[in-house]
């Protein structure tokens, strides 16, 4: 079949068959279909959309373009979790060991951060000695032993997605729900878990800025997962303001350990528990209510924290920093930011705060940028809090005063202080299952 004919069919709103989509993906990965033709197809998809059947078929073809991870060597049902990305979003470090401590199996392949959103692999590499690149055999062995292992993504996981994403990035076709959904889910399907929980963020620090768009993306991804035979559920969670208080790699690890020891901030604890209870529900550990009680108990009895420490030791990491965060390498410069006015914090732009952390050295401006694991910021005040002019609302951590001053300017632009108490916002907006959306 000719690519020209497929482009023409989609341009006129036609539905591509699974065979046509597979031929297209295989031809593009093999270099037989040029970028200019694939660019035309991407734009046709952007304008005309795709049916659920098309999107699922495209995703499966992308997942089949590289390695498929066979997790059958791991006993029991495996559950994966994916976040669409946010600021201060360290929930994998919390919900994965909770699920493992409750008898679930989490074989997690995570990515690095780029732009204003952080990556789980970068956070874990802030732990001295922690290895994110280990053999498949060791990966499986650790999951069988302690229920969880988190490693970096394989270089050959869904290579079609890597190639298509690079093209979407330069052809203004990133913001297409079928293309976003197939990009995310192709990697999830290739990663091999039986069940998938999706954390779809919405708000200023998220890719999907509106609730309706976030729900539409979640519905599409859930339909793909279910269509590919994976039990899939999505939660829509808030990312209008950062999650928790710490932003930056070692700072986020330390805060995650606070949550696992029952001492973490309410927002981060609650979102992590809701994610964990749904992961446990997906692998059949009980009703949502029963799974919630199990998750809470794993924090109360210390088993979730000890599970995380065991995983870290098995992957070469020093768990002393998990027990005492002062043992992490410390930033050379600390800078306090004061409110400068009396009132209430009425806006805390998560995207700008994420960009602040990048300027401080905690994130990447390009994929090859080095990371300062000690850099970042701690928020002492959050959205809705009352402040006086002299209150310290954040502390910045970085390697130089120059970086700190540049970041401080950006941070101040992210904060709005008003005279009225702002309306409260839910942490979780909705739960999306196959053919069902429950709004909270």
Task: Locate each region found by the language model.
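A glycine-rich helix N-cap at a beta->alpha junction
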Residues: 123-149, 219-225, 229
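Short glycine/serine/threonine-rich phosphate/pyrophosphate-binding segments
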Residues: 87-96, 100-101, 108-109, 115-118, ...
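Well-ordered secondary-structure scaffolds
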Residues: 5, 10, 15-18, 28, ...
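Active-site cofactor/substrate anionic-group-binding motifs, chiefly glycine-
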Residues: 49-110, 114
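Phosphate/diphosphate-binding glycine-rich loops and adjacent basic-rich segments that engage nucleotide
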Residues: 144-195
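Short beta-strand segments
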Residues: 109, 143, 151-154, 184, ...
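N-terminal glycine-rich anion-binding loops that anchor highly charged ligand groups
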Residues: 1, 10-73
């Amino acid at each position: 079949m000719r690519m020209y004919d497929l482009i023409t069919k989609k341009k006129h709103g036609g539905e591509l068959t699974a065979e046509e989509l597979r031929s297209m993906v295989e031809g593009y990965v093999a270099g037989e279909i040029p970028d200019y033709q694939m660019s035309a197809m991407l734009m046709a998809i952007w304008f005309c959309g795709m049916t659920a059947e098309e999107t699922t078929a495209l995703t499966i073809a992308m997942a089949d373009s590289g390695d498929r991870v066979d997790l059958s060597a791991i006993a029991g049902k495996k559950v994966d979790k994916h976040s669409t990305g946010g600021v201060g979003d360290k929930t994998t470090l919390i919900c994965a060991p909770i699920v493992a401590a409750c008898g679930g199996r989490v074989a997690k392949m995570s990515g690095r951060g780029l732009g204003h959103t952080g990556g789980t692999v970068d956070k874990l590499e802030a732990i001295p000695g922690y290895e994110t690149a280990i053999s498949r055999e060791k990966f499986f062995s650790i999951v069988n032993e302690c229920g969880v292992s988190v490693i970096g993504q394989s270089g050959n996981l869904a290579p079609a997605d890597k190639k298509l994403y690079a093209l979407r990035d330069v052809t203004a076709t990133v913001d297409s729900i079928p293309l976003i959904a197939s990009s995310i889910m192709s990697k999830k399907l290739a990663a091999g878990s039986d069940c998938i929980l999706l954390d779809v963020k919405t708000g200023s620090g998220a890719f999907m800025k509106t609730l309706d768009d976030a729900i539409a993306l979640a519905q599409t991804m859930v339909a793909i997962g279910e269509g590919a035979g994976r039990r899939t559920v999505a939660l829509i969670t808030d990312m209008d303001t950062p999650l928790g208080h710490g932003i930056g790699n070692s700072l986020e690890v330390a805060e995650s350990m606070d949550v696992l020891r029952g001492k973490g901030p309410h927002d981060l604890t609650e979102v992590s528990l809701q994610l964990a209870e749904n992961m446990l529900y997906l692998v059949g550990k009980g009703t949502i209510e029963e799974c919630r009680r199990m998750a809470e108990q794993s924090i109360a009895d210390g088993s979730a924290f000890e599970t995380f420490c065991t995983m870290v030791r098995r992957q070469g990491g020093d768990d002393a920093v998990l027990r005492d965060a002062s043992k992490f390498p410390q930033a050379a410069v600390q800078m306090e930011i004061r409110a400068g006015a009396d009132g209430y914090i009425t806006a805390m732009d998560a995207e700008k705060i994420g960009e602040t952390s990048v300027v401080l050295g905690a994130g990447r401006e390009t994929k090859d940028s080095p990371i300062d694991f000690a850099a970042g910021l701690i928020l002492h005040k959050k959205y809705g809090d009352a402040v006086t002019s002299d209150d310290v609302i954040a502390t910045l951590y970085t390697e130089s005063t120059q970086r700190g001053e540049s970041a401080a300017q950006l941070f101040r632009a992210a904060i709005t202080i008003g005279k009225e108490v702002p309306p409260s916002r839910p942490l979780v907006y909705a739960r999306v299952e196959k053919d069902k959306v429950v709004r909270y």
